[in-house]
Curated annotation (Swiss-Prot):
Top-level taxonomy: Bacteria, Bacillati, Cyanobacteriota, Cyanophyceae, Oscillatoriophycideae
Highest rank taxon of the organism: Bacteria
Protein name as it appears in the record: Glycerol-3-phosphate acyltransferase
One Gene Ontology term of the molecular function aspect: acyl-phosphate glycerol-3-phosphate acyltransferase activity
Quaternary structure and partners: Probably interacts with PlsX.
Length: 228
């Protein structure tokens, strides 16, 4: 039992460190001499990088953040495919390895999301976990991941507001998980992860309600920065 718990703890620590990789901060700092945390919304995610540094660095950050989310899930599945991990699971008294793996997948996914928003490398600050959540969804179920991305793109095309698109996409995940018949752990991830991502957008929701949320190409006003 102890060995199995230690193994899972190590997996979750690595998942957190993957999620905590502050790609937006590092790219801004290393290549542009800019602390992205002190610019725009203060987020280290691709949207703030886009507003602050431009298209290319934003695209790089987006790809890295999607990849690190997917990698956290791939790590769990790889470890649980190894014979020694399966033996430890059985010795611990867990006979249904597939179900154990599914629960570990969602726990690792949630921890990676938290890592993105609360990165140990930059004073427990970070982004809003939209891109990393997409990577996790694509790794869990590519159908749900692409469905969520489609919702995001449609709303973004109509509204040109990234935060609104992210919020509606986060809401849609639960329905997509349910209607595609995903396992219960994945449906729980959709609900808890969606709530967390929406909570990270509280300041955006306040600006949306006040009709002050910037669209693509616009930057936050001084007043909005003070209230971010």
């Amino acid at each position: 039992m102890i060995n199995w718990l230690v193994l899972n703890a190590v997996i979750l620590i690595v998942a957190y460190l993957l999620g905590a990789t502050p790609s937006g901060y590092w790219i801004g700092s290393w290549f542009y001499g800019v602390d992205i945390r002190e610019q725009g919304s203060g987020s280290t995610g691709a949207t703030n990088v886009l507003r602050t540094l431009g298209n290319v660095p934003a695209l790089v950050v987006l790809v890295i953040d999607i990849f690190k989310g997917a990698l956290a899930i791939a790590l769990v599945r790889y470890i649980y495919s190894l014979v020694f991990a399966q033996n430890l699971t059985i010795i611990a008294g867990v006979t249904d390895i597939d179900t154990a793996k599914e629960w570990m997948v969602i726990i690792a996914g949630l921890i990676a999301i938290v890592g993105h928003t609360k990165s140990i490398w930059i004073g427990f600050k970070g982004g809003k976990s939209v891109a990393s959540s997409l990577g996790i969804l694509l790794a869990i179920s590519w159908v749900v991941g692409l469905g969520t991305l489609s919702v995001f793109i449609v709303v973004l095309t109509i509204s040109r507001i990234v935060s609104l698109s992210s919020i509606i996409a986060a809401i849609s995940v639960s329905g997509l998980m349910f209607f595609t018949g995903q396992p219960l752990p994945y449906q729980i991830f959709a609900i808890t992860g969606g709530i967390y991502v929406i909570w990270r957008h509280i300041s955006n929701i306040e600006r949306l309600l006040a009709c002050k949320e910037p669209r693509i190409g616009q930057k936050l006003s001084t007043e909005q920065k003070m209230n971010k």
